[in-house]
Amino acid sequence: MLNSVPLVELWRGPVRESTHLGSVVICDDTGQIHHSWGDPDRIILPRSSCKMIQALPLLTSGAADNNGLKNEQLALACASHNGADIHLAPITKWLETLGLKDEDFRCGPQKPKDSTTRHALLRTGQPACQIHNNCSGKHAGFLTLNQYLGGHPNYETVDHPVQKAAFEAFEMTTDETSTGFGIDGCSAPNHSCSLQGLARAMAWFASAEDRSDSASQAAVRLVNAMNAHPALVTGEGRACTQLMRAMGGTGVIKTGAKGVFTAILPQQRLGIALKIDDGTTRASDATCLLYTSDAADDWFCV
């Protein structure tokens, strides 16, 4: 049984119309719980909130440097983008540099969130392609790593070297043994962990500057890339982009489906993970805003 707590309430005048339950965990640079609300031990699927972890092998393998990837591509490898031109143009160029095409993706087509792109497709009668998928940046990273490793085309399968590398990074950063996995909306495996484990992984990213190993240095590069390009991480009108801009490069925010959010706060050496029980984005957006802004202001540190 979950020990969730009320995190968000919606009121209409004097009447409370709905309440969203969930859990929040903040971990410090030792991986221990700094503060928590609800159930830190609940097992979740992080969904897209852990894309930074999945992108680590892209750098630690040498594939990123071998292909001359810059901050723009690294940010897109961690993105859940809107499918605006600001996202599609660099991913298209990235694919061309690899000598690959849309059909080499394994994420599947998806209608873009960006209204300009979506309306353009409707006007021209063109179907959405795989590049429009909000995870196509992550999959461009997978393709880059796969090409570097010389793996077979189905890089999304759980026993593929690309996914094995992502899984190893996941267990390393969460410091847990995963209990299983589900197939994410973009066809790649998404491994389970406790909410504390996910917060611990984010704290590992937040304190990466203190360490000299290759994985930690890769984490620093990913955090810096996301901070340098907040518009690429999600896009206009999205909580991640807006909150990262408001924080002025002092924190990384990453959304995941079904009410998951993560935050990396390097200055405080803190990592945050939250899960809304009913999976609603309106509640996870609001919760992330409150707890991240308070943690960034050291409110929890007094």
Residue ranges and their predicted role:
Residues 1, 70-178:
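Active-site-adjacent helix/loop patches that line small-molecule binding or acyl-intermediate pockets
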Residues 1-41:
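Beta-lactamase-like hydrolase cores
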Residues 46-64:
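Active-site SXXK
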Residues 184, 235-274:
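Short, Gly/Ser/Thr-enriched beta-strand-loop segments that form substrate-interacting elements
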Residues 189-208, 218, 222, 260-273, ...:
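Active-site-proximal alpha-helical segments within enzyme catalytic domains
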Residues 203-252:
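Conserved active-site loop region of the serine DD-peptidase/beta-lactamase
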Residues 279, 283-286, 293:
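C-terminal functional modules
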Residues 291-296, 300:
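Conserved small/polar residues in nucleotide/adenosyl-binding loops
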